[in-house]
Amino acid sequence: MAKGQSLQDPFLNALRRERVPVSIYLVNGIKLQGQVESFDQFVILLKNTVSQMVYKHAISTVVPARPFNVAGHQNAQGGYGAQDDMPSGE
């Protein structure tokens, strides 16, 4: 299962570390906006005026509001949060 998340985890971690605003579209068409606060294998914690736990199986699309750098934000952990910052190697 780790191979399936080899793109997903660095993408979400870069969004989290750079505090990039995102729009998350759910499979039912609802649009959520905020910043990725943390995530794991099953959920994303999205922060705006409140924090929302969004299950990944309900997500259709994640759209960053601005360009960001995915390179250098990878580590071998299965989830990321504010206290899990790893050296970026940049």
Curated annotation (Swiss-Prot):
Residues 9-68 form the Sm domain. The keyword RNA-binding applies. GO terms for molecular function: RNA binding. It comes from the Bacteria. GO terms for biological process: regulation of DNA-templated transcription; regulation of RNA stability; regulation of translation, ncRNA-mediated. Keywords: RNA-binding, Stress response. The keyword Magnesium does not apply. InterPro entries: Hfq, LSM_dom_sf, Sm. GO terms for cellular component: cytosol. SUPFAM superfamilies: Sm-like ribonucleoproteins. Transmembrane segments: none annotated. Disulfide bonds: none annotated. Pfam families: Hfq. Belongs to the Hfq family. Homohexamer. NCBIfam families: Hfq, PRK00395.1. RNA chaperone that binds small regulatory RNA (sRNAs) and mRNAs to facilitate mRNA translational regulation in response to envelope stress, environmental stress and changes in metabolite concentrations. Also binds with high specificity to tRNAs. This is RNA-binding protein Hfq. It comes from Shewanella oneidensis (strain ATCC 700550 / JCM 31522 / CIP 106686 / LMG 19005 / NCIMB 14063 / MR-1). The gene is hfq.
